[in-house]
Amino acid sequence: MAKLYFNYATMNAGKTTMLLQASYNYRERGMTTMLFVAGHYRKGDSGLISSRIGLETEAEMFRDGDDLFARVAEHHDHTTVHCVFVDEAQFLEEEQVWQLARIADRLNIPVMCYGLRTDFQGKLFSGSRALLAIADDLREVRTICRCGRKATMVVRLGADGKVARQGEQVAIGKDVYVSLCRRHWEEEMGRAAPDDFIGFMKS
C-alpha cells in the first residue's frame, strides 16, 4: 500500500533539495511524478520549486479550495503517476491533507510532503497540524542552531535585524528566518533570560 509521508523541519534544512532529488530519482527510471507548490503568495498559474543550492523544476500550484485528489486522479487517468510531491505543505488546508491521504489510499500513489512544522511564534501551521495527525510516516529533516544543537524552531528578523515577536504568520523571503534550538528561540522571543551574548538585536 502507498503511504502519505510528511518530511518536516525548520528553515534551510534542505527539505526542497531532498524533494527535487527524490523526484529526479523517479524520473531517471522513466517514472512520472506530479509536483505541487503553494501558490498563496505567487502570481500566475506556473509554479516553480527551487532550492537554495540552485536546483529547480516546474510544479503545479495549489491554493485554498483546490481539490488535489481530483487533479491527481484526472492526470493519472491519462498518464500513470508514480509519486506525488508537495512542497511548502504547511500551507495545505486540512481537507487537502485528507485528499492527499485518499491519493495514497485509493489511487495507491505515494505522496511525499515537505514543509515547516511551526511558525516563528512556535505555533503549528494548519497543514502541518493535519499531516502530523494523519500521515503514515513522519520524518524530521535536521539542521543546527548557531550553538550546534539541533534546530527545531525559527525566528523572524525584520529589516532592522531585530527579532519579530508578533505579526502575520508568513513574511515572504527566506532570508528573514533563522533556525534555532528551543533554548535560544525562547531567549530571542523574550520567554527566557539570555545567558550568552551571541543573540540578535532585541526588539
From Swiss-Prot:
Active site per database record: E88
Gene3D superfamilies documented for this protein: 3.30.60.20, P-loop containing nucleotide triphosphate hydrolases
The UniProt record lists the keyword Metal-binding: yes
Pfam families tied to this protein: TK
Enzyme class: transferase
Residue positions binding ATP: A9, T10, M11, N12, A13, G14, K15, T16, D87, E88, A89, Q90
Coarse class of the protein's main subcellular location: cytoplasm
Compartment list: Cytoplasm
Protein name: Thymidine kinase
Organism: Mesorhizobium japonicum (strain LMG 29417 / CECT 9101 / MAFF 303099) (Mesorhizobium loti (strain MAFF 303099))
Primary gene name: tdk
